[in-house]
Amino acid sequence: MDRPQWPGGLIAQVHGFVFSWWGVILLLAIINLKSFPGIWTIRALYHMKSSFNGQLRQTVASPTAENAQRRVPKTPKTGATDTIDHHPLFQPEIISSHVSPAEIDFNMHKSNSTYFTDLDISRIKLVGRIMAPAWPLDRMHVEYKGRDGEMKRERVKGRPALALGATCTSFKREMKVLARYDVESRILGWDSRWLYIGSWFVSRKGGKGKEQLFASSLSKYIVKKGRITVRPEQFLTESGWIPPRPESTGNSKSLDSLQANGHGATENGKHDAKDTWTWEEIESHRLKGMTTVGGWADADLRLEQAYSS
């Protein structure tokens, strides 16, 4: 079979375009696309929507007396030897990117300031998955201390938010132009106010076990419903990510009263105890993560106090 013959004029035109200034401009536009105005917003919305909707498809009905329409994520163990590291709440979200020429500083490395735009995208992807089951919190009975000093548990009006409160980033190695990398973010732990997320910039070109760490970052998020702060533990419990705290630990009765928590949920919404992670397992993992967070959280508070003093 004869090969198709391309018109000589067309080949000349393509060749002329590729090696013209227009070709150079097109190439620069492609490799700098992530730095164009509006592209960050498109990336953020894409990852938020895909992560949020993807998690919603992995939920099952688990109604309570307070919330008849409650849905929770399916979080069963895959086997008797499955470890808490595999719990979906603690699984990382990963985005892949590259260093565009527009991100280079005068040292010809990725500018420090540009790390934060990538961090935003990675954390948004993670947060979109975590918030999906309970959002927008309209049916949640939030526990909080009222202005009269009394503890309340009721539905709260207002706009929900899972907002970034602070972040700290440590730079390990430089990244040169066009270098490819992944940004991995996962939940480390939480306290009475903040949800802590760890993020890492890594190169995986060496294969598994040979990753190269470029930077690490620690961030904290707060859950809000209107002006009211929602405790991370309550948010995660009513979202079905973690089971209610056992009575023996001395937590509030209201959380103990929740009957269904989503752990070990099957397609029909039923639960099997042998397929679940216990509250003690999750709490142990949270405390392990908080040992990483503790020093930074204290330093952040001292830094704020140093300015005020």
Swiss-Prot record:
Expression triggers: Expression is positively regulated by the leucinostatins biosynthesis cluster-specific transcription regulator lcsF.
Known pathway: Secondary metabolite biosynthesis
Gene Ontology CC entries for this record: membrane
Membrane topology according to the record: Single-pass membrane protein
Localization of this protein: Membrane
Keywords: Glycoprotein, Membrane, Transferase, Transmembrane, Transmembrane helix
Signal peptide region: none
Composition bias, Polar residues: 248-260
Keyword Transmembrane helix: yes
Keyword Membrane: yes
InterPro entries linked: HotDog_dom_sf, THEM6_lcsJ_thioesterase
Family, per entry: Belongs to the lcsJ thioesterase family.
Protein name, UniProt field: Thioesterase lcsJ
Species for this entry: Purpureocillium lilacinum (Paecilomyces lilacinus)
